[in-house]
Amino acid sequence: MTAETVRRNAVKVLFVDDEFIEFRALKKKIADLSEPAVEVEYSQSIGDALEKIRAERFDLILLDNRLLPNADFRETVPELRGIGYTGPIGVVSTDISGGYFQEFPDYGVDFRIGKDEIDVQALQHIIREYVTYDVPDFWKDDYSI
């Protein structure tokens, strides 16, 4: 089995948040997600995320807006893009209403989402919109007119 074949079997997501409890909450929210299969890995810091991205391929990154000590997406996303990551990056935050969130495309962010908005349907939508993935036949009905 080639790496590309394995990659197609599961969408690989890197969740970057300085609070492990947020990762556990995400895993619990998406536990019932069966299609597509999703493999979620965790990084507690931007440094750890950079190491993982250099070592393996991820289809999607969900990045907490604020990582300690005080870096927000305007600092962390350029670091991810700077090492060559070209896949989709979504900024996740408890509050996405701040004015600076309107600037997210300028920093290489593809989308933003509130932590309270993430569930099975939201993740399926994100994968449909941003990740190259072979859509299952039963999803294709959603796109027919």
Where are these regions (language model features)?
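Conserved phosphotransfer cores of two-component systems
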Residues: 54-56, 79-86, 107
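Alpha-helical interaction/dimerization surfaces of two-component signaling modules
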Residues: 29-33, 52, 103
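Two-component signal transduction core modules
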Residues: 61, 89, 112-113
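Conserved phosphotransfer microenvironments
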Residues: 61-80
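Conserved acidic segment of CheY-like receiver
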Residues: 9-30
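CheY-like receiver
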Residues: 120-128, 132-145
